[in-house]
């Protein structure tokens, strides 16, 4: 699906702008600080409901406005959709063809977006930025992943709340925690299997694409996970349950969940060496572009 028309009101430095886009290559030319990057950012926001820059939604609103409106007329060979997002200081509304969408998972993946910017350099650094970026990419290709990730995060939040509430000197509802942990483990397995599937497919082509860009081979995306993989899903689940039980006292002491896909790492390896540590800025940018 491509965007044929973009309409912005009170977005960043634009009070109002309408842009007709072609189905081929579109190039924006202008002086510095004229808003070229803001146009690209608005398209990303329409795809993911949030900016690729780590900023609060309220900063997307023009300083003279009380809200920002973003609208895109999108078309594919089979369907036409009008995507719309209204951002205010305290809320955000999502619409498709005029109908308000309540669930993020029902909105995302309508348009596929890939952005290459200076902010992408953080992608190769281990931690939340990498997980967040990969979650966004996978979400564009798997509606089920969006829902399972939302469910996982909801259960993770409840699990953390329970761990924080435990008084070491009083009895607590272990039956409730066991039921919560059962659900947590099942969702964790679903998330890591989907991530591993995506990484496996990426690695089939990543090395060749990187070689075409740089002339160098042996780029690999490594998935570092604290859940032991097995060909049998039930075996993975049972092993992870046992592992969470062995970590319970430590988690109770620190009041947070120490295992699960929210702790996963993704590492770019070039010739077996971690790119974020040993790679040049050029190699890092080329790796992101290849991905």
Question: Which positions does each model-derived feature cover?
Answer:
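A conserved P-loop NTPase coupling/switch region
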Residues: 106-113, 117-186
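Conserved NTPase motor "head" modules and their coupling/switch loops across ABC/AAA+ ATPases, GTPases
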Residues: 1-31, 171-291
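Conserved lysine of the Walker
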Residues: 36
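Helix-to-loop junction immediately C-terminal to a conserved catalytic motif
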Residues: 44
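Nucleotide-state sensing region of NTPase/ATPase domains
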Residues: 48-130, 135, 142-145, 203-208, ...
């Amino acid at each position: 699906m491509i965007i044929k028309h973009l309409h912005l009101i009170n977005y960043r430095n634009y009070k109002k702008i309408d842009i007709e886009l072609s189905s081929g290559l579109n190039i924006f030319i202008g002086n510095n600080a004229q808003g070229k990057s803001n146009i690209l950012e608005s398209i990303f926001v329409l795809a993911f409901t949030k900016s690729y820059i780590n900023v609060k939604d309220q900063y997307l609103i023009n300083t003279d406005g009380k809200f920002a409106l973003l609208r895109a007329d999108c078309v594919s060979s089979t369907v036409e959709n009008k995507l719309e997002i209204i951002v205010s200081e305290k809320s955000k509304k999502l619409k498709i063809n005029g109908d308000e969408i309540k669930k993020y998972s029902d909105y995302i993946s309508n348009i596929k977006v890939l952005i290459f910017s200076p902010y992408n350099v953080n992608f190769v650094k281990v931690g939340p930025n990498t997980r967040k970026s990969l979650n966004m990419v996978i979400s564009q290709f798997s509606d089920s992943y969006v829902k399972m990730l939302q469910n996982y995060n909801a259960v993770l939040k409840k699990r953390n709340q329970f761990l924080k509430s435990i008084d070491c000197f009083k009895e607590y509802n272990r039956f409730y925690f066991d039921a919560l942990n059962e659900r947590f483990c099942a969702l964790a397995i679903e998330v890591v299997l989907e991530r591993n599937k995506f990484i496996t497919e990426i690695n089939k082509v990543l090395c060749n694409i990187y070689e075409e860009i740089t002339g160098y081979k042996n780029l690999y995306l490594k998935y570092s996970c604290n859940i032991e993989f097995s060909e049998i899903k039930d075996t993975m689940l049972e092993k992870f349950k046992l592992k969470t039980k062995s970590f319970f006292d430590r988690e109770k002491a620190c009041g947070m969940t120490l295992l699960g896909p929210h702790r996963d790492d993704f590492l770019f390896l070039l010739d077996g060496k971690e790119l974020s540590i040993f790679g040049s800025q050029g190699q890092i940018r080329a790796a992101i572009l290849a991905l």
